[in-house]
């Protein structure tokens, strides 16, 4: 432990050569831990000014309920999917008497780490988070978990820590979308994806890849690109159009990117879907505001938010063990509109 750094359950576990879960049980007077060991751990915690999350403990052991505050970290507010998840979290939390404190990471690791530190200081009873694109170090997550604060990831999960997670079926959603493009006549389908350190990017690419291979189509790396917003799509698409054998279909990681592709193709005189077909991934409001309306994969963000909030509150209230890792997958649905045949 660093000098002057706050004590965590992980530090106590290291001192006694036991697991964090055992420390947590001892601090809660669990009969599963011997009395001698419980007293030793509790005394050590007191001597080092360590106290479990005050709100979480009060919720589990008291009929007088203190303020119930859940910290929520969002990478960006402008994305329809994140706003729909937030709505699901807030409505589900409010129905059980909780409030949420929302913070924006802005896709930046430094801001995300500072938010986690702030949430710890504010004594939130739990944290729901979607990882920023820039995040490659996960110590700030682990510190919250070690301090006994339950955490649930949504959408962009972190495989570097053991925490519950709620995602949509990115793999199957992508595979079904690309399969539909192939069955609609596309033979060269470009993939516009996000950073590959994100699990959702990997899963959507794997769905794309497996759909092609299943239909005997080889992957062409020249039409697989990192592109996850409209501005990038408007820069990259003209370059792909100049290839000797340009794409006749595009699968984009989100609707914003797909719409960038759509308007670039239309500006170049291409007919959609007659000449080129496009599929996105979100089914937000923008999907029905473009012309033609966008074929896309519906993510059901509200349901993701509901599930994430439910998992977290069950842990806070002791209805689900702190150390239990829950993984829930929300099914997607292909919504066929005017950018495909």
Predicted regions, residues:
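Alpha-helical recognition/docking segments in bacterial nutrient-uptake
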Residues: 1-7, 64-179, 183, 240-242
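N-terminal helix-turn-helix DNA-binding module of bacterial transcription factors
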Residues: 1-66, 341
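Short beta-strand segments enriched in small/hydrophobic residues
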Residues: 15, 20-25, 61-78, 180, ...
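Hinge/beta->alpha junction and helix N-cap segments in small-molecule ligand-binding domains
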Residues: 74-84, 102-111, 156, 165-176, ...
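Short helix-capping segments at alpha-helix termini
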Residues: 95-96, 147, 212-219, 242-246, ...
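Short acidic capping loops at alpha-helix termini that bridge into adjacent secondary structure
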Residues: 188, 219-223, 271-277
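Flexible loop/turn connectors
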Residues: 238-341
